[in-house]
Amino acid sequence: MTEITLNPGFALLLGALIALIAPQRAQSTVALLASLAALGLAFTPSFGEHASFAQIGLRVVPLRLDALSQTFGVLFALVSIMLALHGADLRARAETGALLVLAGGALTAVYAGDFVSFVAAAELSTLAAVSLLLLREEWAAQEMGMRLLGWQALSSILFLSGAAFSIGESGGADFARLSPRTPGGALILAALGVKAGFPIAHVWLKEALPRASAAGGAGIAAFTTMLGVYGLARGYAGDPTLVWIGMAMTILPAIFAMAEDDLRRSLAYGLVVQTGVMIAAIGVGSPLAMAAAAAHAFATTLAFVVLAMALGAVRERAGTARASELGGLARIMPATAALVCVAALSIAGAPLTAGFASLALVLDAFAQAERPLVYLALIAAVGAAVAHTAIKIPYAAFFAPARKKPPEQGYFASPQLAMLFATVLIVGVGVAPGWLYQFLPPDPVRFSPYDWGRLLTHVQLGVSAALAVAAARLTRLYPLEKPGDLRDIDRLIHGPLWSLVQRAAFAAGGIHRFWRRNEQSTADLFTRVAGRWAALADRPTRRLASDGVWLMAVLAGLLALGLVFA
């Protein structure tokens, strides 16, 4: 039997090209067939490197398959199937193509074995993510698309710079173990951190998810952040720096998630918290911890795709996703409410869900690592997940008293079909976790989550968190949702820092205009000053200092003139 050795992402990219020219009625079918083909290709090749070749003196590996890439590859292919099902009734041609490119680029990057292939595929996925926002009619979404482009361009520059350093240090372009204590490793770590939502960089996610469409937000959150997690697992397993970064990601965003009024922003903060758990597990680096990180990425992504699609449907139906304006939607959206409850319970780690299967691995991995602070941070993250995902989102959107009369118009069935498919996977993995465990890196995991000790631990965590939330609500210690937006670090980035950048740009423009108007005289002045400075090299130190002060005064005067003329 002939083995097909083709990067699975190529099937999605080819599907994107076909979808752009196919009739409107056929594009969802094309997307679904391309996603199914990608899933089939994810299981076809044997482990190892395939079809490597030399390019510009570097070894390029477009297909490398191991347990880590297969786990994320299967996950990305499944998410692509969900997005294809979601758009059967709803989507414009351009959005279908963009989602296929988003998924295809991320999937291609997961199977790439070198820096060149990885960054090329990852940036193709990034451009598709940006286009999903630019295709929206709202000005706020288009503005966020340009901000996302800026963040991801920064990630690209950092990655390419780090790759150049790493290639110079090692002589090869293989994407393998890296050290953040080298220039190349530090730059690539920062680049992947932007994608994964490290502190400060997380603001792009909490702004992009609410501005995108239901499918677009789910795709951006799933593919971009999990591609960052994959890159960290590939290059930085066992690095203690990631433990502390992951802990930071589980603390402050959890508070924002509980206090945020916009449920889609709250969901984005919740994803940052869960991503922090994965990154901390990667930092622990033991075989069990690496398996736990991959399993948690798998389970969390499935649940968050359901929640993102559901909140997108809520926004389309009610015209808002703000907790202060929602409530009572379970009566008119009962199926969506039920699917949201299952996904929320999975995030909270309830038994018989994929979240339980992954969280059991995470708890055991952190317990074996003997890191008390990390273990406590994980317990806090579980409690926060119960508070803001398992309780807040379902209650505020579907079961709280209605604040206004809910709309009665109908809605399409295809989003429910996509959410149902994801929910079946969530329950299926929870009931039979061995199916997921067989893919996990570095080797198939032999682990039984359903023993009485682990079940009791999870039940205690869930019940304790629920009681704590109830007590905090009754005593008004819980951060109640208020209309408006919370102040995050992006207020500083888009406020004083952006104003400073604008002033610097105006100053540079003023200096440039002054130079153009007085080009010859200014050039003569610089020539005389430079000659004077050079002549001081052999003179006493005091004279050097005196003339140096005059030089600085001249330069300060030129800068002041630039500010005046700006």
Show which residues each predicted segment covers.
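Hydrophobic transmembrane alpha-helices and their helix-loop junctions in integral membrane proteins
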Residues: 82-118, 128-406, 410, 431
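Hard-cation-handling environments
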Residues: 411-465
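Alpha-helical transmembrane segments and their helix-start/interface "positive-inside/aromatic belt" motifs
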Residues: 24-34, 144-149, 331-339, 410-422, ...
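Transmembrane helix-loop-helix hairpins at membrane boundaries of multipass inner-membrane proteins
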Residues: 1-97, 172, 177, 203, ...
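Short aromatic-rich membrane-water interface segments that cap or initiate transmembrane helices
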Residues: 56-72, 178-185, 365-376, 449-455
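Aromatic-capped, Gly/Pro-kinked transmembrane alpha-helices
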Residues: 436-456, 477-566
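Cytosolic juxtamembrane amphipathic/interface segments immediately preceding
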Residues: 58-60, 325, 404-405, 530-542
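Hydrophobic alpha-helical transmembrane segments
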Residues: 65-76, 191-192, 375-384, 453-470
